[in-house]
């Protein structure tokens, strides 16, 4: 009985692992990158950074160094090589 239960458990685990697919990766460049990022961020409920946010840093150019990922990084990660939706969402 224990052997049958162990075999059933192992079969269940093997079937579950085989159905788990890694997240698809694609290359996103230019307008396709901008549109995809805008759509994903909109669906996630993230708004574009406003000018009011820049005011607390003194200059707009200081903001990328203080929080989040810079815009140049997304091209490196998603245009020059494939990236997943999770990586794109990290730039929202």
Swiss-Prot record:
Pfam families for this protein: Insulin
Alphabetized InterPro entries for the sequence: Bombyxin, Bombyxin_A, Insulin-like, Insulin-like_sf, Insulin_CS, Insulin_family
Family annotation (CDD domains): IlGF_insulin_bombyxin_like
Assigned protein family: Belongs to the insulin family.
Propeptide residues, chain positions: 50-70
Name of this chain's protein: Bombyxin A-7
Lineage: Eukaryota, Metazoa, Ecdysozoa, Arthropoda, Hexapoda
Residues that span the membrane, as ranges: none
Signal sequence segment: 1-19
Functional note: Brain peptide responsible for activation of prothoracic glands to produce ecdysone in insects.
Gene Ontology terms: cellular component: extracellular space
Disulfide bonding pattern of the chain: 29-79, 41-92, 78-83
């Amino acid at each position: 009985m224990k052997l049958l239960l162990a075999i059933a458990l192992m079969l269940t685990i093997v079937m579950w692992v085989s159905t788990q697919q890694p997240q698809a990766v694609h290359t996103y460049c230019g307008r396709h990158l901008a549109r995809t990022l805008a759509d994903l961020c909109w669906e996630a409920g993230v708004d574009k950074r406003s000018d009011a946010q820049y005011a607390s840093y003194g200059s707009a150019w200081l903001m990328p160094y203080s929080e989040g990922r810079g815009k140049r990084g997304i091209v490196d990660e998603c245009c020059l090589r494939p990236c997943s939706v999770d990586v794109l969402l990290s730039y929202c």
